[in-house]
A protein has these predicted regions:
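Alpha-helical membrane segments and adjacent membrane-interface helices in multi-pass membrane proteins
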Residues: 54-121
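Individual transmembrane alpha-helix segments
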Residues: 1, 297-343
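Hydrophobic transmembrane alpha-helices
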Residues: 2-74
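Membrane-water interface at loop-to-transmembrane-helix junctions
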Residues: 141, 145, 189-193, 227-250
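Aromatic-rich transmembrane-lumenal/periplasmic boundary elements in polytopic membrane proteins
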Residues: 252-307
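Hydrophobic core segments of alpha-helical transmembrane domains in multi-pass membrane transport
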Residues: 16-29, 49-54, 119-122, 147-162, ...
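Juxtamembrane interface at the cytosolic side of transmembrane helices
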Residues: 225, 338-361
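Short helix-perturbing small/polar motifs within transmembrane alpha-helices
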Residues: 114-158
Length: 361
């Protein structure tokens, strides 16, 4: 779901970036007003969860791959505004340091994964959990459904962004300048696999990690359950809370990241030039195949050659062990950068934040 540069027009990139500005402004104000120093530092751990979950690629129907995002998880832990900030920072790190996702398309990727996903998940979770929280299975089911809905809506938004490109941007001969797949192709190609697999992974990961943190460190949760008073008794009963189990979980995820290498194939809409040409040819549509002609400056001619780690691994001829080591190293770097960055930011926040009625919505 990381849209690379050149798949969307500069105009689309600009519109999506502008659309995210008020979202970021609102979320920053909300987070600074509601999170104290402890929770601001914990937000860095949450951003690390998002960064790591996006490294676990899973095979999807059709031979493509996908991944969870973690936006729903953070929305349940700290609220959707905090999730928007955490996922945005994780996406920026991936784009700038690892070449995963475009720089120009950063606004679009944030709109889909840092805005639509966590806010939709928070709305769904509150609607379901308000009715089911008194049942032992209520909160886990609410978390699974909220994660599934959030990721599927994010995938739908990405599909629409892909699909409108050939409608709006073509060259003199009528060939698409950017993503050549129309809505009739992009929506089912993106939405169905995410509904069947990736959305389920997002939901299960959300429920599992949220339940784990709820048992080991309930005091850090200030999301929808806390706002709605559904955590009051549990929080009061927890005399001691520790982030050590959570940090151990982060370490386990870092070591396990090479599992993401087992899923072969590119994510739909994240091909390099060669992969894009192959995808167009496999579509069996002559008008689409015209968009990759060598005699015109079409979208495929300007596409990146893949993420930095993949390119380096191929250049060095690394085997699975070498690629696994690179993957773990990138996970360590990502987690370190995110936790240190938010720890430094937390130093600018007051020791005791306002966690009353103004907590995450």
């Amino acid at each position: 779901m990381h849209i690379p540069d050149n798949y969307l027009s500069p105009q689309t990139d600009a519109v999506m970036a502008v659309a995210m500005v008020p979202v970021w402004v609102h979320c920053i104000k909300k987070v600074r007003a509601t999170l104290d120093r402890e929770h601001m530092a914990f937000l860095g751990i949450c951003a690390a969860f998002s960064f790591l979950l996006m490294m676990f690629n899973v095979p999807l129907p059709g031979g493509t791959t996908g991944h969870a995002v973690g936006g729903a998880l953070i929305a349940l832990l700290l609220g959707p505004e905090a999730a928007a900030i955490a996922v945005s920072v994780a996406l920026a790190l991936q784009a700038l340091l690892f070449g995963d996702g475009g720089v120009l398309s950063f606004g679009a990727n944030c709109f889909n994964m840092a805005f639509v996903l966590p806010f939709a998940a928070a709305i769904v979770f509150r609607a379901l959990n308000s009715r089911l929280h008194d049942k032992s299975w209520g909160t886990p089911v609410s978390a699974i459904v909220s994660g599934w809905v959030g990721l599927c809506l994010a995938a739908l938004c990405a599909a629409i962004e892909f699909g409108i490109q050939p409608m709006l941007f073509t060259n003199a001969s009528g060939a698409p300048l950017y993503c050549p797949f129309p809505l009739s192709v992009a929506i089912p190609a993106m939405l169905i696999p995410h509904m069947l697999v990736a959305g389920v992974v997002e939901g299960v990961a959300t429920a599992a990690i949220y339940g784990f943190i709820k048992k080991t460190a309930p005091s850090v949760i200030v999301g929808p359950e806390a706002v709605d008073g559904q955590l009051a008794a549990e929080g009061a009963a927890a005399k001691k809370t520790s982030l050590v189990p959570t940090l151990i979980l982060v370490a386990v995820l870092v070591v396990a990241t090479p599992l993401g290498l087992l899923a072969t194939g590119d994510a739909w809409g994240e091909w390099d030039a060669e992969g894009a040409a192959t995808a167009v040819q496999e579509a069996g549509d002559d008008s689409l195949q015209a968009s990759v002609g060598l005699d015109t400056p079409t979208f495929a001619d300007a596409l990146p050659t893949g993420d930095y780690l993949q390119a380096y691994s191929e250049e060095q001829g690394l085997g699975f062990a070498g690629q696994a080591a690179m993957y773990i190293l990138s996970g360590v770097i990502g987690v370190a950068v995110l936790t240190i960055a938010f720890r430094l930011i937390s130093l600018t926040v007051k020791e005791n934040g306002a966690h009353g009625d103004g907590r995450a919505a």
